[in-house]
């Protein structure tokens, strides 16, 4: 009995020694350089065909897909904070923090503009009166430089005075670009409405089809906007 106990103790000691050594081996980490290749790198030919067809589709008359991006957040929580995470089919994306583009933003903008044919816009908050002139100057400079495809104006439901629009339109001059207003057309001076390519109507608060029809009727009737210039939008819950 004594020998058996000693034998068992020896086995246990041996096991613990092996386990300790094994654990030491497991906790020794080695760092290896690795690169994750996407569709473009894995199959360049198929990628080229896909993106060519995508750009061709976006050049045709179709239902325009519009999505805002709160880029360059103070703290990034997931891929949703980056332009590359948006569906390829998106046509127009205003960058809500266009004044502070990150290097990731610039890389993603190059990708979606060149490969997907996506239009990326400089977003201006017209309610920030103290920053409006600076925003207009920066927006015009970046559009002229080719960094952005156009400008999106937001007013949070407030009317935009002609004094705010005139500096922007004068500075742009004949520069070809896309102009989008996030709001119903009647919030803009009537003389400047025709200069905008699209008006984004937020119908998040609509409770039924009647509310949506009323918003559209108000924009086309009182706002005098062509129906094909209206984009109906909703803000997803939880964003």
Predicted regions and their residues:
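Chitinase-like catalytic core of GlcNAc-active glycosidases
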Residues: 59-239
């Amino acid at each position: 009995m004594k020998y058996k106990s000693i034998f068992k103790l020896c086995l246990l000691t041996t096991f613990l020694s092996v386990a300790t050594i094994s654990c030491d081996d497991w906790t020794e980490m080695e760092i290896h350089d690795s690169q994750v290749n996407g569709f473009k790198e894995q199959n360049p030919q198929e990628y080229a065909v896909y993106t060519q067809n995508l750009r061709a589709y976006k050049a045709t008359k179709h239902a325009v897909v519009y999505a805002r991006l709160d880029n360059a957040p103070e703290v990034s929580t997931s891929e949703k904070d980056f332009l590359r995470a948006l569906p390829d089919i998106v046509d127009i994306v205003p960058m809500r923090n266009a004044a502070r583009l990150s290097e990731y933003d610039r890389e993603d903008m190059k990708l979606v503009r060149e490969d997907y044919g996506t239009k990326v816009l400089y977003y201006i908050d017209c309610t920030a009166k103290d920053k409006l002139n600076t925003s207009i100057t920066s927006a015009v400079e970046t559009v002229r430089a080719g960094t952005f495809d156009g400008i999106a104006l937001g007013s949070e439901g407030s009317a935009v005075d002609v004094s705010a629009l005139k500096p922007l339109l004068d500075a742009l001059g004949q520069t070809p670009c896309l102009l989008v207003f996030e709001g119903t057309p009647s919030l803009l001076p009537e003389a400047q409405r025709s200069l905008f390519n699209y008006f984004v109507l937020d119908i998040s608060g609509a409770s039924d089809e009647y509310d949506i029809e009323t918003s559209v009727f108000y924009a086309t009737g009182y706002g005098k906007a062509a129906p094909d210039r209206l984009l109906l939008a909703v803000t997803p819950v939880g964003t």
